[in-house]
Amino acid sequence: MGSILSRRIAGVEDIDIQANSAYRYPPKSAGNYFASHFFMGGEKFDTPHPEGYLFGENMDLNFLGSRPVQFPYVTPAPHEPVKTLRSLVNIRKDSLRLVRYKDDTDSPTEDGEKPRVLYSLEFTFDADARVAITIYCQAVEEFVNGMTVYSCKNPSLQSETVHYKRGVSQQFSLPSFKIDFSEWKDDELNFDLDRGVFPVVIQAVVDEGDVVEVTGHAHVLLAAFEKHVDGSFSVKPLKQKQIVDRVSYLLQEIYGIENKNNQETKPSDDENSDNSSECVVCLSDLRDTLILPCRHLCLCTSCADTLRYQANNCPICRLPFRALLQIRAVRKKPGALSPISFSPVLAQSVDHDEHSNSDSVPPGYEPISLLEALNGLRAVSPAIPSAPLYEEITYSGISDGLSQASCPLAGLDRIIENGIQKGKTQSKSPDSTLRSPSSPIHEEDEEKLSEDPEAPLPPSGVELVLQESSSPESFGTEEVGEPSLKQGSRVPSIDDVLQDGSPQHHGCSQPVPPADIYLPALGPESCSVGIEE
């Protein structure tokens, strides 16, 4: 399902719970709501901004409840300042919606009465265990023996409890429980801060019997209603809470970490749209640093270090930030015969002096991209058309005056020559339409390629990739204006030596598979050429 990071502090906190001791922001009486420091990753940090919530708006703290709770803290391990909590249930808040019922027989009205407007709630959820889901309307929250308990002012505002087995993408629908908004006041549609009344609460409690490990686990979705000018209603999610080991955690979104692979592909004319996982500053390294309190995951480690000393605004929303949080994902190293499976373990890195890949990586694990750990391997977009296949012919003279190291295709020419030397000059093939119109091939050039039959064949399964040549001259292209050229008249360009990539082999007992060269979209200063056999 997911992982939640929490800090563990040694000792037991004793709080005197009184009826009139209510926490809310802003506080009714004068005094400090926050301390002068905070703990993260097992280290203590001073608060540069007084009375500031580090992970969001200060008003978000009102969703945690107005009364303090008493619970013990587990003594942390010396080498594990951060504990990973497992989330067994997750309600997809974006899937929450209202379904209206228009059956007049179910909503009779008398003269002078308001017409009844009946709605029901539907949503999608994931569960790694058996769960029991209950809906509460106009409910207040209380903690009893470490468990979150919700109560409604009217029993008719509480639905029956529905039990589900474990599964992913399960649909919740309960037509028997209908919400009649004709009986609601306008101020009851929104969250009442003074009385602590939530318009609607969806509670999913793990129901695994006497299993001690999951006792007290629950997921809570808080939502409100909106009334439109046409008289219709809609539901708006407010916050989500996760109760793990009888401790309530407020969930906050991280912007820029969503799974873009599962979204529908929409054509866009904006090529610079933010649809990748690279850092928004350098556009090369992967994002792994979170900006607080705006919660934008948009920076890599090196750019985050630069931003700490040169600016104090988020590059996305331009709001001032108070902390930078690096989130690192690791996975277990696969065995020799075991398939690769993603088992992300999130770890925070607060050391800004060392950023090597081996920092804070447990033994037996290897660091991976955070987005790949949560969303899986990134698939190639099907909207990108495949480039035509070409074969390249060896040539000489183009790198006169240049060293061997400045010609990245030098080691590539021998392999390509070996794959083509068996071919003979042939007439126009059916797939000759793939031939570039600006690259005429001469018969004498093709005859010279077949003069060396003793060269060894390329090994099977060879795959070579060349990345970003240091000498753009070796990749320069020229337009050929004349239909034919005399051999030796001038140095041929790379366009002059491209030909069709499907030669037929004759006079060979075992046919050799052709070498395919795919050419992606080439920029003016760099080139990426791959050979796959």
Curated annotation (Swiss-Prot):
Motif annotated as Required for TSG101-binding, chain positions: 385-388
Pfam families found in the cross-reference section: zf-C3HC4_3
Region called Disordered, residue ranges: 421-519
First and last residues of each zinc finger (RING-type): 278-317
UniProt EC number: 2.3.2.27
Reaction catalysed by this enzyme: S-ubiquitinyl-[E2 ubiquitin-conjugating enzyme]-L-cysteine + [acceptor protein]-L-lysine = [E2 ubiquitin-conjugating enzyme]-L-cysteine + N(6)-ubiquitinyl-[acceptor protein]-L-lysine
Compositionally biased spans, kind Polar residues: 423-439
Biased composition annotated in UniProt, kind: Acidic residues: 443-454
Lipoprotein recorded as keyword: yes
Cystine residue pairs: none
Any one GO molecular function term: zinc ion binding
N-myristoyl glycine lipid modification positions: 2
Pathway of action: Protein modification; protein ubiquitination
Sequence positions bearing Phosphoserine: 429, 450, 502
EC class: transferase
Post-translational modification: Autoubiquitinated in vitro.
Any one of the GO BP annotations: protein-containing complex assembly
PROSITE patterns: ZF_RING_2
PANTHER family recorded: E3 UBIQUITIN-PROTEIN LIGASE MGRN1 (PTHR22996:SF2), MAHOGUNIN (PTHR22996)
Domain comment in the entry: The RING finger is required for ubiquitin ligase activity.
Function of the protein: E3 ubiquitin-protein ligase. Mediates TSG101 monoubiquitination at multiple sites. Plays a role in the regulation of endosome-to-lysosome trafficking. Impairs MC1R- and MC4R-signaling by competing with GNAS-binding to MCRs and inhibiting agonist-induced cAMP production. Does not inhibit ADRB2-signaling. Does not promote MC1R ubiquitination. Also acts as a negative regulator of hedgehog signaling.
Known partners and oligomeric status: Interacts with MC1R and MC4R. Interacts with TSG101. Interacts with mislocalized cytosolically exposed PRNP; this interaction alters MGRN1 subcellular location and causes lysosomal enlargement.
Protein name: E3 ubiquitin-protein ligase MGRN1
